[in-house]
Design a protein with these regions (language model features):
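Hydrophobic, gly/ala-rich membrane-insertion helices/peptides used by toxins and envelope proteins
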Residues: 1-5
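Metal-dependent nuclease catalytic core centered on acidic motifs
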Residues: 6-88, 117-204
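Low-complexity, polar-biased intrinsically disordered regions enriched in Pro/Ser/Thr/Gly
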Residues: 90-96
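Conserved catalytic cores of phosphodiester-cleaving nucleases, focusing on short active-site segments
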Residues: 94, 103-116
Length: 204
């Protein structure tokens, strides 16, 4: 496992030369959609953050957020799930192929629905958001849990449910590359759906 200016990185990922590695590619969407904090126009990867959240400012400065941007640079869609998101949801829009402005190629609005039970949240809320976006051809490949609001066990239940139902007629589930979980101890857990292997990264 390597370390670069962008924080902990995935195995096999190229090492960034400087922090400009992210900032030079960053294009803030501003008021066009406040829920998307980072979008990489080259790869289509993105990081979703709930604006106005009490941890927003500190969240953008930590190693986990840099890790999320590293994933986005490689074309992953990454959710930042705030610990105080109890009701309602996170809505977001994405351009199918990018463009000079956000509204050039909108493909729809999708919702992450927060439920009261963590296991149900992992099983139905997050994965339903993935499948709805997948139906529109958007690549979503990772779930990013900033403050450990979803336990490793509940995520595993969601993975088990996903694997059990994937490929079933009418399920509508997309091919998911992997699931990323960050717990309160800043431990990074990546479940590779392609190899069914689990690996841990720890903040140094």
């Amino acid at each position: 496992m390597g370390k670069g200016a962008g924080g902990t990185r995935l195995l096999g990922a190229p090492k960034p030369k400087s922090h400009a590695y992210f900032t030079s590619e960053r294009k803030r969407l501003g008021t066009l959609d406040n829920n998307i904090d980072y979008y990489n126009w080259k790869t289509g990867g993105f990081v979703i953050w709930q604006e106005g959240h009490k941890h927003a400012n500190e969240g953008r400065k930590n190693d986990e957020f840099r890790f999320a941007k590293e994933l986005a640079r490689h074309g992953y869609g990454v959710y930042l799930l705030p610990e105080d998101a109890k009701n309602g949801g996170i809505s977001f829009r994405l351009s199918a192929k990018g463009g000079s402005t956000f509204s050039d190629a909108k493909v729809g609005t999708y919702y992450y629905e927060q439920t009261t039970k963590k296991s149900d949240n992992a099983k139905y809320g997050v994965l339903s958001a993935l499948q709805h976006a997948g139906d529109k051809g958007i690549k979503l490949a990772a779930i990013y849990d900033k403050y450990g609001s979803l336990s490793r066990l509940s995520i595993q239940k969601g993975i088990d449910w996903y694997e059990h139902n994937r490929g079933k007629k009418g399920s509508g589930l997309i091919k998911l590359d992997g699931v990323l979980v960050v717990n309160k101890n800043h431990e990074l857990y990546w479940h590779d759906m392609r190899t069914s292997e689990n690996e841990w990264w720890e903040k140094k």
